[in-house]
């Protein structure tokens, strides 16, 4: 009798131990799953609560969201700007500004109580933990792939994959039309894009933001020497004296809006070096705005393409 009771007691203990181990393993797995990939947490939030309250810590991700018809509850304002970028400001009237991308307003972000936070790895990659204390995060490497890839990724997260694909198709169709218009104007000529600031003259490389839309989407041929630029940098600073070396048939020009930059461009225009450029003498100089042309996002590229279409339709 004693032996049977002892065996029964040991069996009960064994069952309890196994049950405890099972619960511990399940708890460990759940913990690992929630910290290993915070994008999964973001997807779970979406499925449980419908449309998410998204906070975007990247102007480019904000604009990708806008392309899909989604307005983030909060967004950084980007760069040195003191407000949302002009070409999208009217679409962000109900969005809380979260400060510049390099120094976001964490208190304002916390007060928003977002369901999920979108981060740009370049600016927030070292601070993921502090954002995770507020909400699940999804980190994007904007140097990995193109804006199309980023738009598709966001489309998956917000259940708007069809809308993302349609946006890309519409952009491709318009691009083909603009290609034809530009070719009718400059033929197979070479192209360069420059930016005039208060202190320097820059030539854009093949890298984003300017390179992809000119040399990939529109298939234009870079002027001499541009392919030799450091492809990890968006531009190279030059002196006006070397402008003739590029021998460009057409020049796209971005001039900063401040008075100093405007004065510097006027001075450049009056310089014999500028006046002697092939593109200038042929009338193939095209002024463009910093926004949307330097906004490497789905909405930025679409608006830039719209401007190019209008500009070259008049030629």
Where are these regions (language model features)?
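Structured C-terminal subdomain patch of bacterial secreted/periplasmic proteins
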Residues: 249-315
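C-terminal motif of bacterial Sec signal peptides marking the signal peptidase cleavage site
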Residues: 17-20
């Amino acid at each position: 009798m004693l032996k049977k009771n002892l065996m029964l007691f040991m069996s009960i203990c064994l069952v309890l131990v196994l049950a405890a181990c099972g619960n511990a393993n399940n708890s460990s797995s759940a913990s690992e799953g929630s910290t290993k990939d915070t994008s999964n947490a973001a997807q779970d939030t979406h499925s449980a609560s419908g449309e998410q309250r998204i906070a975007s810590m990247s102007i480019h991700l904000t604009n990708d969201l806008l392309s899909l018809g989604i307005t983030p509850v909060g967004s950084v304002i980007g760069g040195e700007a003191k407000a949302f970028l002009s070409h999208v400001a009217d679409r962000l009237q109900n969005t809380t500004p979260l400060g510049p991308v390099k120094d976001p307003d964490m208190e304002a972000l916390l007060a928003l109580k977002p369901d999920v936070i979108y981060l740009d790895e370049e600016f927030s990659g070292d601070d993921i933990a502090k954002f995770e204390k507020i909400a699940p995060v999804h980190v994007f490497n904007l140097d990995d792939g193109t804006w199309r890839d980023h738009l598709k990724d966001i489309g998956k997260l917000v259940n708007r994959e069809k809308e993302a694909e349609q946006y890309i198709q519409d952009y491709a169709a318009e691009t083909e039309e603009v290609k034809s218009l530009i070719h009718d104007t400059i033929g197979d000529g070479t192209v360069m894009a420059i930016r005039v600031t208060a202190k320097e003259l820059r030539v854009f490389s093949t890298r984003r933001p300017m390179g992809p839309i000119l040399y990939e989407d529109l298939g234009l041929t870079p002027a001499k020497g541009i392919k030799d630029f450091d492809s990890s940098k968006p531009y190279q600073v030059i002196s006006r004296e070397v402008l003739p070396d590029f021998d460009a048939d057409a020049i796209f020009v971005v001039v900063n809006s401040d008075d100093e930059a405007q004065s510097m461009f006027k001075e450049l225009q009056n310089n014999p070096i500028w006046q002697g450029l092939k593109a200038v003498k042929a009338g193939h100089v095209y002024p463009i705005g910093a926004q949307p042309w330097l906004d490497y996002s789905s909405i930025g590229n679409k608006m830039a393409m719209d401007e190019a279409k209008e500009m070259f339709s008049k030629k």
